[in-house]
Amino acid sequence: MKAAPLDYRYRFALHGMLFFVGFAFYWLPNSHESTWLVLTPWLERSGWFSFSSATISLLILAILCAATAAFLRAWGASYLGSGVVQSRDMNGDLLLADGPYRRTRNPLYFGTFLHAVALALLMSPFGALFTIIAVGLYQLRLIFIEEQFLAAKLGQPYLDYCKRVPRFFPSLMPRVPPSGAKPRWLQAVLGEIYMTGVAISFAVFGWRYNAFLLTKCVLISLGASLILRAVQPHTDKSYQQ
């Protein structure tokens, strides 16, 4: 393990701050409507959607983004280990090329970006724009930090892996053969309970078409994840993140 830059060590807190700022745009004048509510009549005016179908289409988009984010992060964590995912230090003793890492080098960060897109529909338009751009740029920053560390740590095998596997957007087919790691789904799902809770909230409560209710569900999911993180042991073997 290696001590990491501060913006890597405190990445969970910084993500939380970015999402908080995104929601805080509601406090600005003339910014009291959710992006969901603003986009619905805009799509209706395009002539392709009725008001009802536009509302439902945006909800389905949010559900798909939230669910895909939760699945990708849990899938990646099942191979990587929740202890490594949550560690403040840089980890890279072994090259992991299993599960989602056969299709993208950064399934966790891609999942986080999709999660930001889902939450953006609950924010004001300016908050949504800020969040998607800020979270996207922050993912790139974290990726570059990790790539420099892993290239120095693992050498040519990692560079060869990078040539074959996309950095961010997953490929439909695996790009490398499996390395033999086994997934541990229970600890992964528990470690990603926040993402899972948000995805379930969108799927279950989204049909009430209430952005404020969904925002409360996000906060409840966050609280549950903080409690679990405080009590969950971190004894996982070190892989690349």
Please provide the spans of the model-predicted regions.
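Catalytic beta-strand/loop module used to bind and position nucleotide/cofactor moieties
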Residues: 101
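Membrane-anchoring alpha-helices and their flanking helix-loop junctions
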Residues: 1-98, 114-241
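Conserved SAM-binding loop
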Residues: 104-114
